[in-house]
Regions:
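Conserved ATP-binding/catalytic motifs of P-loop helicase motor domains
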Residues: 1-167
């Protein structure tokens, strides 16, 4: 798989058609707190684990201390157990913690992806290949300086990648 860099516009990287990732639209704080309170113990543990990680990461960025090592967390559960709901709440909290006034909302801190369109839709995300404009032709695509710089700009804030339905 290679990145299809030609899908990136050479104009304005924040134009809606150039946006690689869906924005996380922050919900009303009362609704967010209420939804968080209604998580079961396992969901709350997972949310707190990720929120603590993101807080440590932000503190490291602000104080110039070493950034914590990346984490890989797998959430298991059968259909209807609230995995998609948990992913949406994690997205909300990551955005609330990391985003500062003046940040470009099209430069994400978190992205939600999945291998299938149905799973991506359930988490208000995108398929992995559409998120990163991956092509499956097998042809290698070289990256010129302008496109490389554009990708760096778009991905500079990225701290959390969610891949739903990962087996």
């Amino acid at each position: 798989m290679e990145f299809d860099y030609d899908k990136l516009s050479s104009n304005n990287i924040t134009a809606p058609m150039d946006r690689l990732f869906k924005r996380v639209e922050i919900m009303d704080m009362d609704l967010l707190l209420n939804s968080t309170r209604n998580l079961d113990d396992d969901q709350l543990y997972s949310l707190n684990y990720l929120v603590d990680y993101v807080k440590q990461h932000k503190k490291a960025l602000l104080t110039n201390i070493p950034v914590p090592d990346p984490v890989f967390l797998k959430i298991f559960g059968s259909a209807g157990t609230g995995k998609s709901h948990l992913i949406r709440l994690v997205s909300q909290w990551v955005e609330l913690i990391m985003r500062t006034e003046g940040d470009n909302p099209d430069v994400p801190y978190i992205i939600r992806t999945s291998f299938t369109g149905a799973a991506a839709s359930a988490i208000d995300g995108q398929t992995l290949h559409s998120s990163f404009a991956l092509n499956f032709s097998g042809a290698s695509t070289s990256l010129d300086d302008k496109k490389r710089d554009k990708m760096r700009h778009i991905l500079r804030n990225l701290r959390v990648v969610i891949l739903d339905e990962f087996r």
